[in-house]
């Protein structure tokens, strides 16, 4: 969305053992390295990407690494890649408050985080842990996105809360998170990710949030 606004955008895929970013963007070519460093891949619209999957000989090979090795890879994605001038860089992290988030918060100049959650009440506790960790590390929480928030029927337009009532507003108020957005269960969006055409998908659910972040 920020790339569509003319901003130079990059994604560092820190979900080392479960990287999905390259597939969603339709990028499969292996990364190239020079004496100066690693050259990031580029998507159709020019989003710069770095992911461990773009370094594997076979993208279906598992990554069986312990925490310190994973943390080292994340650091190298920041220090050894020739990112160039970038307006916004997104770091995709795995769920939880483990080695990867700690490494990112300690090793990268993070301006803020966006938390992605789902409607189940149990997830609220996990969100609080993530918020508390960010604030312990003096990282601002910019907003929260509720994924799979509802399903909207194509025929009647009615919204069905498949995974139960949304707790987004309650969590945002309790954790003092200033911005919220909801993402529906959408078969067309899932198909676009599977086909590597996420950039071509036209959905307005995150437009307001993206605009507010771009203005920061």
Predicted regions and their residues:
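Glycine-rich phosphate-binding loops of nucleotide-dependent enzymes
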Residues: 50, 93, 106, 142, ...
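Phosphate-binding loop that captures ATP/GTP phosphates
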Residues: 5-60, 64, 71
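Gly/Ala-rich phosphate-binding loop of Rossmann-like dinucleotide-binding domains
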Residues: 3, 105
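C-terminal lobe/tail of nucleotide-utilizing enzymes
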Residues: 131-216
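Conserved nucleotide-binding/hydrolysis micro-motifs of P-loop NTPases
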Residues: 16-18, 55-57, 95-97, 119-123, ...
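Residue-level signature of catalytic and energy-coupling elements of molecular machines
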Residues: 13, 21, 50, 74, ...
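Conserved Switch II/interswitch segment of TRAFAC-class P-loop GTPases
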Residues: 84-91, 97-98, 109-130
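Phosphate-binding/switch loop-helix module in NTP-utilizing enzymes
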Residues: 56-104
């Amino acid at each position: 969305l920020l790339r569509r606004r003319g901003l130079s955008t990059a994604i560092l895929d820190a979900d080392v053992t479960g990287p999905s970013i390259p597939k969603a963007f339709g990028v499969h070519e292996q990364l190239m390295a020079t004496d100066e460093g690693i050259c990031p891949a580029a998507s159709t619209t020019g989003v710069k990407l770095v992911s461990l999957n773009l370094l594997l000989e076979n993208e279906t090979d598992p990554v069986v690494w312990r925490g310190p090795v994973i943390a080292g890879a994340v650091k190298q994605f920041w220090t050894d890649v020739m990112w160039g001038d970038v307006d916004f860089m997104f770091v995709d992290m795995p769920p939880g408050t483990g080695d990867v988030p700690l490494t990112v918060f300690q090793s990268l100049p993070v301006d803020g985080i966006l938390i992605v959650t789902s409607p189940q009440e149990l997830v609220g506790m996990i969100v609080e842990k993530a918020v508390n960790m960010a604030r312990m590390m003096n990282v601002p929480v910019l907003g929260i996105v509720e994924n799979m928030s509802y399903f909207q029927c194509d025929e009647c337009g009615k919204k069905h809360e498949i995974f139960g009532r949304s707790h987004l507003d309650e969590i945002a108020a309790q954790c003092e998170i200033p911005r919220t957005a909801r993402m529906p269960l959408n078969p067309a969006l899932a198909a676009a990710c599977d086909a590597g055409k996420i950039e071509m998908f036209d959905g307005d659910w995150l437009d307001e949030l993206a605009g507010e972040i771009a203005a920061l």
